[in-house]
Amino acid sequence: MTSSMEEDDSISPESISLDTLASIRSLIINADTSDSVISSVFDFLTGLLSRGNSAILHHVLKLLSDLAFRRKELAPQIFDSILSNLLRLHNTVAEASHERAAVESLAVLASLSERTPSIAAALSKIDDEVFASICLGAPISSRLWLLRNADRFNVPSSVLFTLFLGFSKDPYPYIRKVALDGLINICNAGDFNHTHAVEGCYTRAVELLSDAEDSVRSSAVRAVSVWGKVMIASKEEEMNRRDCTDAVFLQLCSVVRDMSVDVRVEVFKAFGIIGTASESIILQTLSKKVLGAGKGKKPQNLLSNGSADVSSAAGVYIHGFEDEFYEVREAAVDSFHSLSVNSIKFPDEAVYLLMDMLYDDYMVVRLKALKALHHIADLGNLKIQETYMPAFLDAIVDTSENIRVEARNILKLAKLPDLKLVNKCIDGVLKSLEMYPQDEPDILSALFHFGQNHTNFLVSMVKRFSEKLGTASGSKAEFNSRQLSASLTLIISAPLSNKQSITSIPPLAFSYSLAMLGKFSSGLHDMMDQDMLLAYLTHCAILSSSSGTEFNKGDVFFHAYRDSNADLAGNPVLLPGKDIPAESKYMACKAELEIGNQALKFVNHILLKIKAAWLLSQSGCSKEALRALRACKQELATLTADSSISKGTLDFICQYVHVIELLVQVWPHFNYSRHISTCSSVEVELLMEEVEIKLMEIRCRFTGLSTEESLVLELVIFGCLLRLYKFEICCRLSCMEKLSSTISQLELHHEQQCTKPSDFLTETKKSLEEFGSSDDINSCRLLDLIKIFKCFSPEQFTFSVNLQCVSAEVEVPGNGPYSPISFVPGLPVAIPCEITLLNVPRDTCLWLRISRNDETCQFVYLDPNLYNGNGREKRFMFTAVTYMTPRAVVFTLRVSIGIECLFEDICYRKQRHGPKHPVAYLCKEREIHLSLVSRT
């Protein structure tokens, strides 16, 4: 057969049988077929394209498609052949067989262009005229395919719009449906907004709401919603937009009782797309009786139905919730979300309907109803009355886990009006805990939030569960019971949200809570980690056991905790008890969703926990504060470099946490007595020196500091005040000079940044002026200044992308214990150093420090011309000459790179050579091995 293809090109298409075509396909799909045979097959098939009849053209196109798929190198040639034949068919006399072949050719061309991107651009040769001509002349089945796949061809949206709008009047219902779907796709693409065209398309969709076919009416509803929304947005005046919205909404209401289930489902989905309407119309959807405000009212911009009025919306949602098909009920409940956002009265009127939906037979409907209630509760508009409580309690003990989770989410936001309902709700939750013990962590979290929202019933709750606490002391089984853990969760939640006297809570509650720390931490992990929970419970236990001790001493910690959770989660339960408008809450939630930056939230949480730890240390809980800070460092270590937080920012926060950790270790020595023992004095001095070194390193090693610089400078001032308070006799002069200099720098920084100085800075400057040159410094005044230091403010962190860490590396190529550098005692020796600098500014002063084991050291200045490039990373070779060659056979030197801290006004070196200011080191010391030159 192959030879006949090569020798005879005059084979009549009519003489080719299906067996012959099947043999050709066998050659195509056989991987062992030679290239020459494939070439002959290609020539034969392309020849049949131009002279083939409709009987075999379908098979020829299929074979060419298979050939292009198997032999990708032939795809461009096959594409060109089919395209040429398509254009030839377009220019010939139109026949039904030709039109069908043209559509099949388009299908093959579209498939080839998608499989071979290199030839996709050639598809543009099929212009809008060719496509429209084929579309208009194609048979019904082929026309349906063309309309469904129109987006696969480079046809302008204006041409597609005209085609779809025209075919929406086609006598065949499937064509009308596909045409409407095409109009919807054009609208969703957002590239067609001509006013008259939009109104015309909307009008046509409204006309098709009365179509005899269910599928056409269903597509018409979708078209009315999407094109109606575009039409609403096109209105410039607010009044016109509102009237247009009402017109579209009422137009949809007119078909809510359609006999087709699909149409009714689409109507309620469309309500969610429109999202709003006038208050009177929305309220009318909840009442079958026409309300007085809506009688006779007609929207002015209704384009297609002048007789529609507000009465068409009567009982729309009641019909939706009572529909016999669950799909309709689900869609009706789902559309409550968007409508409840834009209406104040609507949620109050709708709660009883949603509560009834909690008895629905279908789980998906109940779940949607709970989500709608949660949405309303999140806006602060949910008021659970006694009538609704049985339905809500049934949801809490529902067999579906998703239902129970959503019900508990509502419980976290619920605010019940009286103690009777509170007790009923607690009983329901405890029943759920017994039925589903696996839900215990989430139930504890829900009870914790519930307790925070009902602190006015704290005394009653404590009284109710006091018997359980008493029984627990004598029963090990009761002590470990889930009922007890739930009771304790309610009791310990109250202090975090209320300044009540903590003595109203028995100390036994906090003691048992400490014993159940692991269980509580797993349930409250979304609000605080185990270290912070331990600190909180310990602090509460101490205060509650002290007779008459009020909660005021611990307020600083609990305010920090509350602020931390409010900033992290945006949870309204943890905010102060002020009335917040529903609109503000909605906008806050929306802004939180738009940010969507989990890494940034995580770091914000870390920073606020740092503040809480510092305030905790001031309350005398230094061990708990140190534990919390170490946990912060471990959490920071989990953030990788590819997160949205820059490495410079992470390095800065880690250094900052380390400084605060040192200050927390220092603080107990300042909190109790001014005069301390010699051992303690040495320990404090070492800690203070480490704090000063770390602060100096932060100032030198980080570039791009903006508001963070004020934070560092305040820490420097704070360190000076601590030194003056403990060691003012021996270091008064240097401390006062450094204090004055730092205050001036900080004031200049605030002027440049146009920011307001903190109270700490203002009070310190005022006190410094009062001290003057006096020899006697008021220690009480110093202590007051130390105690008003806030240590942290979230506004002082801007997470600038310009915040970068300066670092360096130094290597001595080829040097090691077995390949030392040769030297002669007493003579200088050259050390070849390969230096890498990262983020080093041009105006820095770098020194290479070379030291011996006996602490003798030498500084070598690095000329800025060596690293004066513009790149972030700079590499260069530098030969350092050292004169420290002792009389020894072998010895080692240590080399490192440091940056001179020029901002320090006091020179600390009197030598002629070397840095005149303190040096902050940018890398770890590197050992250099040297060996005496061997005599030969």
From Swiss-Prot:
Cellular component GO terms, alphabetical: cell cortex; endosome; nucleus
Induction description: Up-regulated by SHR.
InterPro entries, sorted: ARM-like, ARM-type_fold
Function noted in UniProt: Intracellular shuttle that promotes movement of SHR from the stele into the endodermis. Required for SHR association to endosomes and localization, and for intercellular movement of SHR.
PANTHER family on file: INTEGRATOR COMPLEX SUBUNIT 4
Note: Hypomorphs (siel-3 and siel-4) have reduced movement of SHR and cause defects in root patterning. Inhibition of microtubules results in mis-localization of SIEL.
Name of the protein in question: Protein SIEL
Organism for this UniProt entry: Arabidopsis thaliana (Mouse-ear cress)
Gene for this chain: SIEL
